[in-house]
Amino acid sequence: MKKGIHPKYEEITATCSCGNVMKIRSTVGHDLNLDVCGKCHPFFTGKQRDVATGGRVDRFNKRFSIPGSK
């Protein structure tokens, strides 16, 4: 490997908006501010919403259904 061509790989601090602080190693060179992390992301916390919206056929049937037919 050639010397002097690789970026510095150093320890930085990544701070999440929820207050979680992590020490990570990166070539970025400055501290990071994150929007979400593993402690506050809905997928990892189990508070994920199921957004099961109907498709075009469901909207059509809802709009043009005859009242009292079901």
Curated annotation (Swiss-Prot):
Cofactor binding note: Binds 1 zinc ion per subunit.
Give an example GO molecular function. Answer: metal ion binding
Q: What biological-process GO terms show up in the record?
A: translation
The record ties this protein, via InterPro entries, to: Ribosomal_bL28/bL31-like_sf, Ribosomal_bL31, Ribosomal_bL31_A, Ribosomal_bL31_sf
What UniProt keywords are attached to this protein's entry?
Answer: Metal-binding, Ribonucleoprotein, Ribosomal protein, RNA-binding, rRNA-binding, Zinc
Classify the source by domain of life: Bacteria
Where, in this chain's numbering, is Zn(2+) bound? 16, 18, 37, 40
- Which cofactor does the UniProt annotation name? Zn(2+)
- GO cellular component, as recorded: ribonucleoprotein complex; ribosome
Subunit note? Part of the 50S ribosomal subunit.
- Family from the record: Belongs to the bacterial ribosomal protein bL31 family. Type A subfamily.
**Purpose:** Binds the 23S rRNA.
Q: What is this protein called?
A: Large ribosomal subunit protein bL31
Q: Which organism is it from?
A: Klebsiella pneumoniae (strain 342)
